[in-house]
Structure formats: structure tokens, C-alpha cells
């Protein structure tokens, strides 16, 4: 019997912007690149691709993804997995975005789930990274017409 438990990073932020603007910023490849990473993202269920940035110690800089859920202006989810030589036994998580209209804007919720005990370094990096990334997301959304 497998009793392994996993953890999740959850970051929520209220943004004084429209659902449409936030949705565009989390689903359109050029906008994603402005606040997250270079990518070949398409918000189509089943689409597979990569997010990538310069490599650093302990990481080749590439994250594989597959889009799992697309509900326009409401929910987006995709896998977020180690790539290349790091894939075997590497990080295998799911990123889920939930957008909810609230007075004066949008409640943005990002959850990256599936961190195992051996993923502690990735978990800590994700906690730091997603807080920073949501700040960058809000900066990009504020520039959209």
C-alpha cells in the first residue's frame, strides 16, 4: 500500500483587473514569456510543450507541460514536469489556475500540487518563485489594454 503524501504551493492574489486581461496573461505565449518563462504554450487541452530559461545548478532550465483543463476566464491546468535526463524520477506536478470575479477585480489562485518528500528543494523554490511570479503577472496585466 502506498501511503506517500504530497504537498502543494498555493498563492492567491486579488488583482484590480478584468477576468479577460488576467486570462490573456496566463494563456497567451508572448504574455507568459513577459512574466514567467519563454514557452510554446497553447491553451488547448492535450497540447504539450516546454517552458524554458537558462539552466542553473541542479536544473537544466526546461519544464515539460501538457494542458489538462481549459475553462475560459475561469480555470486552466497543466502538468509541470522535469525534462530530459532529469525526467526519470524527477519533478511531476500540476499547476492549476482559478480565476474568480470579485468586487473590483479578480481573485487569482495558483496551486502547484504533487510535491513529494524528495522534492523539498523544488517545493521551496516554487514557494518563492510563484510569489514573485504573481507579482510579475500583475505587472504585465496592468499594461494590457
Language model features by range: what are they?
Residues 1-40:
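Hydrophobic ligand-binding cavity/cleft-lining segments
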Residues 6-12, 48, 62, 75, ...:
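Intrinsic-disorder/low-complexity, polar/charged segments enriched in Ser/Thr/Lys/Arg/Asp/Glu/Gln
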Residues 13, 63-69, 93-100:
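Hydrophobic/aromatic beta-strand elements that line small-molecule binding cavities or substrate pockets
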Residues 19, 68-75, 98-107, 142:
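A short, structured loop/turn motif at beta-sheet edges
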Residues 22, 32, 49, 67, ...:
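Hydrophobic pocket/interface hotspot
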Residues 41-82:
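Glycine-rich portal/gate segments that line the openings of hydrophobic small-molecule binding cavities
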Residues 83-131:
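Beta-strand/loop substructures that line and gate deep hydrophobic ligand-binding cavities in soluble
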Residues 139-145:
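Short, highly charged C-terminal tails/helix-capping segments
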Amino acid at each position: 500500500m502506498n501511503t506517500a503524501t504530497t504537498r502543494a504551493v498555493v498563492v492567491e492574489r486579488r488583482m484590480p483587473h478584468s477576468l479577460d486581461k488576467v486570462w490573456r496573461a496566463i494563456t497567451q505565449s508572448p504574455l507568459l514569456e513577459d512574466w514567467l518563462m519563454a514557452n510554446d504554450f497553447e491553451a488547448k487541452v492535450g497540447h504539450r510543450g516546454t517552458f524554458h530559461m537558462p539552466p542553473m545548478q541542479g536544473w537544466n532550465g526546461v519544464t515539460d507541460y501538457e494542458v489538462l483543463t481549459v475553462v475560459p476566464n475561469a480555470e486552466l491546468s497543466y502538468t509541470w514536469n522535469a525534462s530530459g535526463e532529469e525526467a526519470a524520477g524527477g519533478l511531476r506536478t500540476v499547476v492549476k489556475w482559478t480565476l474568480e470575479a470579485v468586487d473590483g477585480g479578480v481573485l487569482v489562485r495558483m496551486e502547484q500540487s504533487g510535491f513529494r518528500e524528495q522534492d523539498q528543494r523544488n517545493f521551496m523554490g516554487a514557494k518563492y518563485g510563484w510569489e514573485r511570479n504573481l507579482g510579475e503577472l500583475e505587472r504585465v496585466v496592468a499594461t494590457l489594454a
